[in-house]
């Protein structure tokens, strides 16, 4: 069931969050889960439902009458100092807990139970800024809650990996390291906000901190609302033939001219037609040397034979790229809804290739055992395989 928790801290700050729990979830586990979300130690929390405080930690939430969609109130108890305090009747009562002190954690992080402070060193106290001193309990709660576990995998992969490894020591180590890092960042934030407002360096750091927060918030919203934006898409390739040789061509409407690699031109036996007077440098994301230009050749797409010209590049990982000159010449249109390339001058269409049929250099992953191979090496291997196959065909055709 989904419960909404309205939290009121000791300094009267408020926060609201939702928790997905089972009906048989015991109250003490629910307190620990609220501690994880709000930062209020379980020993200092008071949970109220229907104007009635919930006190028996071993009773289930359902036994208190809680059901899906209910709202509970979480209050932080006031500190009870056993030491006799000197009464100053003429002085007003001032709460100093909300004053930020440079170099220390926030007020909620400093309020630790006395029993824990007696057995914890200062380093251990700094490592548990939110009172999460029981990694085993936290691990059990996360494993018992698939929703929280999926959020952990999405937002904190290192901690999720340590959790799923089954090693409690590793999980505790990663958790403590992240808590210490969070405490250091919080101390740095407090130091910056407490610095001289006219200090340009401090203001620049505050500006950078705000910018990073905006980036994180933007990324969190994107992961929740549009997770598909983090995926990768396969590029648009089609099957065609040049001089009778099969070629996988990349369709790129953003390229000005149609290009072909030198290796592909050699396989298609059109290097003899290269006009080297058209040599130059192709500039885009990078620069590559243009060997020359083939002024006219035929490209077969499905059953159509289309006239096309190629600029031959010396070092090009892909075999052929159909640029805007060829696409406009034949009035081609890219139909992403049907996943086809439509040839406007003939009315025919060809389907874009799935990722499994793309050349190695265009796949999102080069495949098992080929992660370290560069696209240039793959092109050389394909050229060697094509030459070997051509030689074998010539041997078989001999009488």
Curated annotation (Swiss-Prot):
Record-annotated membrane-spanning stretches: none
Localisation: Cytoplasm, Cytosol; Chromosome
Gene3D superfamilies: Acid Proteases, Phosphatidylinositol 3-kinase Catalytic Subunit, Chain A, domain 1
CDD domains for the chain: RP_DDI, Ubl_Ddi1_like
A GO cellular component annotation in the UniProt record: cytosol
Name of the top EC class for this enzyme: hydrolase
Sequence segments annotated as region (Disordered): 99-134
Cross-referenced PROSITE patterns: UBIQUITIN_2
Motif annotated as Ubiquitin-binding, chain positions: 376-395
Residues in the signal sequence: none
Keywords of this entry: Aspartyl protease, Chromosome, Cytoplasm, Hydrolase, Phosphoprotein, Protease
Recorded GO MF terms: aspartic-type endopeptidase activity; identical protein binding
Domain Ubiquitin-like: from-to ranges: 1-81
Main location (coarse class): cytoplasm
Key word Phosphoprotein present: yes
Pfam families: Asp_protease, Ddi2_HDD, ubiquitin
Job of this protein: Aspartic protease that mediates the cleavage of NFE2L1/NRF1 at 'Leu-104', thereby promoting release of NFE2L1/NRF1 from the endoplasmic reticulum membrane. Ubiquitination of NFE2L1/NRF1 is a prerequisite for cleavage, suggesting that DDI2 specifically recognizes and binds ubiquitinated NFE2L1/NRF1. Seems to act as a proteasomal shuttle which links the proteasome and replication fork proteins like RTF2. Required, with DDI1, for cellular survival following replication stress.
Protein family according to the UniProt entry: Belongs to the DDI1 family.
Subunit structure of this chain's protein: Homodimer.
UniProt-listed PANTHER family: DNA DAMAGE INDUCIBLE 1 HOMOLOG 2 (PTHR15397:SF3), SODIUM-GLUCOSE COTRANSPORTER REGULATORY PROTEIN -RELATED (PTHR15397)
Name of this protein: Protein DDI1 homolog 2
